[in-house]
């Protein structure tokens, strides 16, 4: 009887110990589940942060590409404007050369006209002298008439030359007028081009400032990219660590659940043994 009681007490003690171990396993399993849920939540948070960082990185790279494209367009526009200015300067130089040649032709025609006018004046003076002078003899008169005819012929030739010179002078004046018009147009175009060049210069300064700002922004973007890349690597490392922690915790939970099942099985067996012992005790009494 004492042996049975001792056995029952031992079984009861073992049962209590099994209950304590079962409760301990349940608490450990609960804590492990909480740690696993917390680790999964941290992993999801890290994944969201990684996605946000990747989106920021894509947006930064897109802005950098847009700024570079605008800068290339401004540089092409500046090159085109410089080419137009060079072509117009060449045209202005050619117009100036045409004007110089026209002025030379005008000066030559004016000199020839002066010579013809002087010859005509001299012939007229000679004719008047011959008319006023008393002619002594017929031979002298014939000679004077011949001289007069020659002088008239020279005067007619001078008139013809004068007309030709006047015609050429009119042509030269017309050419000069057209050249002056072209020169005025060229000067107006020069003023316009100078204004455009000033605007282009201002735009170039703005572009230089924009380029400097773009370089600063590019450097900032590069620093941001480096920072984001570092943060991304750190987040990935933390995510991998969290994933490994979750896996480790999951294994611990599985182990504790297995122990809990084993302890429950032992508890059931002890309960069965106690029931059997009580039955045997009752039967013996």
Swiss-Prot record:
Main function: Tropomyosin, in association with the troponin complex, plays a central role in the calcium dependent regulation of muscle contraction.
Subunit architecture: Homodimer.
The record's note on its domains: The molecule is in a coiled coil structure that is formed by 2 polypeptide chains. The sequence exhibits a prominent seven-residues periodicity.
Top-rank lineage group of the source organism: Eukaryota
Protein name, as recorded: Tropomyosin
GO molecular function, one term: protein homodimerization activity
InterPro entries from the UniProt entry: Tropomyosin
Lineage: Eukaryota, Metazoa, Ecdysozoa, Arthropoda, Hexapoda
Key word Protein biosynthesis present: no
UniProt keyword terms in alphabetical order: Allergen, Coiled coil, Muscle protein, Repeat
Membrane-crossing segments per the record: none
Coiled coil: 1-273
Pfam families to which the protein is assigned, alphabetical: Tropomyosin (PF00261)
Family: Belongs to the tropomyosin family.
Gene3D superfamilies in UniProt: 1.20.5.170, 1.20.5.340
PROSITE patterns registered for this protein in UniProt: TROPOMYOSIN
GO biological process, one term: regulation of muscle contraction
PANTHER family in the cross-refs: TROPOMYOSIN
Disulfide bonding pattern of the chain: none
